[in-house]
Amino acid sequence: PEGFGELHYLLSIVGIITFVSLVGSQNTIIVYTAKKIPIQSTFNFISLIGGIIGFVVLFFIFNRIDIGFLVLGYIINNLVIGELLGKKEFNHYLKYILIQKILTPILGLGLFFGFGIEGVIYGLALSYIAFSFRIVRSFRENRINFSLLSKRKGFIFNNYLSTLTGTFHGQVDKLIIMPIIGASVLGNYSLSLQIINIMTIITVIFYKYIIPHESSGHNVIKIRKLLILSNIGLTFIGFFIVPLILPTIFPKYVDVIEIIKIMSLSLVPMSIAKIYTSKFLALEKSRFILIGLGISLSIMIPTMIVFGIWYGVTGVAISYVLASVTQAVYYVIMSKKWDKENNIEK
């Protein structure tokens, strides 16, 4: 658990630096690409410059280059995926994802035996190498045009802050757990989080499908209902079935059983949050997303510290669920309020 916790602590730092550098967030790219606005090369240029700066900063702070290379890999991944989804090139999207997922265990495990945790990080960075060719192609197809940014700076800036807040929201738990509760607890929590992330794959796929279609004005009500129903089923699996299987696969992670039961309760709220995030992005109302993430973060940080000290990793899991529920409730309220006001205007 300790080594696993250390790895995820470093990955959380990489994640934050990545999205600080990533001016053109993936969601922004999806929305504007779906609307046929040739803004991709401009976002690529600025984000890659930011990534190089992040690389240098991480080197001076940690005296290591592996995490810097991973930052560049994450940035390239986000830029390319945003373009593919915005253009609705779902076959190419699947191809790139499969290549990266196949390379991850091959390179990660292969380099781990030679270089330890540092090798795993190098392996992750190299798994994104195929994405770089798409970046080069994008620069060839579209010229850099900063005027496209200035016309849309409000939405871009709000969405940048939303993405950055969301990233901090997703990584702050590791930054809190490591120094306060320890690497062993972080290891158990990180494994639980990885399992939850696997269970949210359906949500992520639906979400990435919904954004470009909703931005293009298509009706996605049936897909929303299907997403909610699938997550109700996954919650049942996470609460009752997964805890029965885990001890045979991860005998050293006994604390994970109760954590998974608790954290699986966040699956439905997270799917609801994704549904309304897509709606707000399509409407270019990223301010709602930013506020929702801020409220969720304001719940997560204090409760994670207090509950973590009082109840250990179980308290951390409870905090995670509370933050997810709060975010979903806020989005539902704001969506209904906006719909009501919009109908009055009409």
Feature map (PLM): residue ranges:
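Helix-loop junctions and terminal segments of transmembrane helices
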Residues: 18-37, 196-218, 279-282
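Hydrophobic transmembrane helix module of multi-pass membrane transport proteins
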Residues: 45-161, 265, 269-272, 277-278, ...
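Alpha-helical transmembrane segments of multi-pass membrane transporters/permeases
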Residues: 37-46, 83-109, 162-165, 221-228, ...
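Alpha-helical transmembrane segments of multi-pass membrane transport and lipid-handling proteins
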Residues: 21-22, 27, 44-68, 133, ...
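Small-residue-rich transmembrane alpha-helices that serve as helix-helix interface/gating elements
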Residues: 121-132, 194, 261-265, 298, ...
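Hydrophobic faces of transmembrane alpha-helices in multi-pass small-molecule transporters and flippases
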Residues: 64-68, 91-98, 148-180, 198-202, ...
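Interfacial/gating helices of multi-pass transporter permease domains
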Residues: 1-16, 155, 159, 175-197, ...
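Helix-loop interface residues and adjacent transmembrane-helix termini in multi-pass membrane transporters
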Residues: 87, 114, 180-183, 217, ...
